[in-house]
Amino acid sequence: HRSRVLRYLELYIFPHIGLSDIRQLKTSHLLAPIKKVDASGKHDVAQRLQQRVTAIMRYAVQNDYIDSNPASDMAGALSTTKARHYPALPSSRFPEFLARLAAYRGRVMTRIAVELSLLTFVRSSELRFARWDEFDFDKSLWRIPAKREEIKGVRYSYRGMKMKEEHIVPLSWQAMILLDQLKQISGDKELLFPGDHDATKVMSENTVNSALRAMGYDTKTEVCGHGFRTMARGALGESGLWSDDAIERQLSHSERNNVRAAYIHTSEHLDERRLMVQWWADYLEKNTVDYITPYDFAKRQV
């Protein structure tokens, strides 16, 4: 992590102000190289640079190198990144999708990755970098840590939870069967999904989307791996069975309302989420036979 921060500074900041006297730096001096990065479309990089530069200047204030922090006034100067919308299939196309998935003849590990993505609807990095020691097979639980040990040479492999706190994912019996199958393949390794040619690395970030393309889908307009989260969110909401808090907790979404966020955080909704992920798996299974809406499937179970 430290080397990555230094690399960003060397690339984008030092060429502009690296030789400057820190006591002479103004907000505009700090902001100029960061805005240049922002204007190039690298909004996330620009946001991280702003955070790092602000932290460095804060350290300088705390250690009496400068009297005040000129970086504090950079707030609000960068583009706000719009939420990205990922393509996802409507529930009416679930039977078609599940039939294509059943007919998929690629690697078994890849098929399992697609199915687990669909059943758990976690983020791509949360699944790709998963370790076997995160799973409790007796309780059918997956504990995704806030941060993982970095895999040398694998970009972003330190990623655990996006919200920087442990996330407990209850697992359906269908997901547990897949994990048992996967254990026959990679159970002797640390990672669930080791790389093709090097078991110390992980499967490519494009694996799930490549499988979807092999199944005949356009991952830019029809469905992509991240779109499974949208598909699950839509069906769970349409069923009318589950509270928004439980759904949002399962998706590990952040809550902008601080009071509500504190409530959701302290209340894991684990019992409801256990029932919910099992309902989702059963609903998908039902759609392998014929299409039924989430609402109608929910009514049959009440």
Q: Residue ranges of each PLM-predicted region?
A:
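Short, basic (Lys/Arg/His-rich) helix/loop patches that form interaction surfaces
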Residues: 99-111, 120, 181-200, 206-249, ...
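Basic, Lys/Arg- and aromatic-enriched nucleic-acid-binding interface segment
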Residues: 37-52, 62-130, 138, 148-150, ...
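Basic/aromatic-enriched alpha-helical hairpins
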Residues: 1-40, 56-59, 258
